[in-house]
A protein has these predicted regions:
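Short, Lys/Arg-enriched N-terminal segments with co-localized hydrophobic residues
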Residues: 4-20
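Short N-terminal leader segment in a subset of presequences, especially plant chloroplast
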Residues: 10, 29-34
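Glycine-rich beta-strand-turn "strand-cap" elements at beta-sheet edges
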Residues: 15-18, 28, 59-71, 96-118
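Residue-level signal for well-ordered alpha-helical positions
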Residues: 42, 64, 88-91, 100
Length: 118
């Protein structure tokens, strides 16, 4: 049952856009003393998360907390295409994000996945 729902979603998605492409970036924010989680909480409470989600081309922006690593926060960030990412990276929000990351002395590990379809 889940498979058919998923297939229907993908078909509708492709039909709406003619083709699809998504770029998913997994960002692991790594800190100490709970700072990664504090960073994510500040991102939400400051409104930055809502602002990123409202940007043209953003398809997903969600934080997750690994059960086996309390000092890491995973952000799954998905965009329609590279152009949307480039615009986001030049935005004022990126400066705010960098300032928060510096405030909490976080390290960053990045994984990038491209899903293309015609």
């Amino acid at each position: 049952m889940f498979g058919k729902k998923c297939e229907k979603y993908v078909r509708n998605y492709i039909n709406e856009r003619g083709s699809y492409m998504s770029i998913t970036v997994n960002l692991y924010y790594i800190g100490t003393n709970g700072n990664a989680r504090k960073f994510a909480e500040d991102m939400v409470s400051s409104g930055i998360v809502d602002a990123v989600r409202a940007e043209e081309g953003n398809e997903r922006y969600e934080y997750f907390f690994p059960m086996d690593d309390p000092e890491t926060v995973l952000l799954i960030d998905r965009w329609k295409n590279q152009e949307a990412i480039d615009i986001h990276h030049k935005s004022e929000m990126m400066k705010q994000i960098a300032e928060l990351r510096d405030k909490y002395k976080l390290r960053l590990r990045v994984e990038r996945y491209v899903d293309e379809g015609k």
